[in-house]
Curated annotation (Swiss-Prot):
Pfam family, one: Defensin
CC annotations in GO: extracellular region
The species this protein was found in: Arabidopsis thaliana
Protein name in UniProt: Defensin-like protein 44
Subcellular location: Secreted
A GO biological process held by the record: defense response to fungus
Main subcellular location: secreted
InterPro entries associated with the record: Defensin-like_dom
Signal peptide range: 1-27
């Protein structure tokens, strides 16, 4: 009986501690870590491909870049 009472008390303390903890870290706003200005500037071509695009993006402070050909980008070098 004493073990059950101790176990229930410990369980209630854990539940109470978890409910009183600050969980705002999980609900915090996601903010971009890099630059957020126009990320698709240069047009890609036969001479300006993924390699040059990635190099230019790294020089501009982005982590990477590649040529995107889908309709909203229109064959531009987009940095990420």
């Amino acid at each position: 009986m004493a073990i059950t009472k101790t176990s229930v008390t410990l369980l209630l303390l854990i539940i109470m501690a978890a409910s009183l903890s600050n969980f705002s870290v999980l609900a915090s706003e996601i903010k971009p870590t890099g630059r957020v200005d126009n990320q698709c500037k240069e047009m890609c071509s036969a001479t300006f491909g993924d390699g040059k695009c990635a190099a230019d993006c790294r020089k501009a402070g982005f982590s990477s870049g590649r040529c995107l050909t889908s309709s909203p980008f229109g064959n531009k070098c987009c940095c990420t």
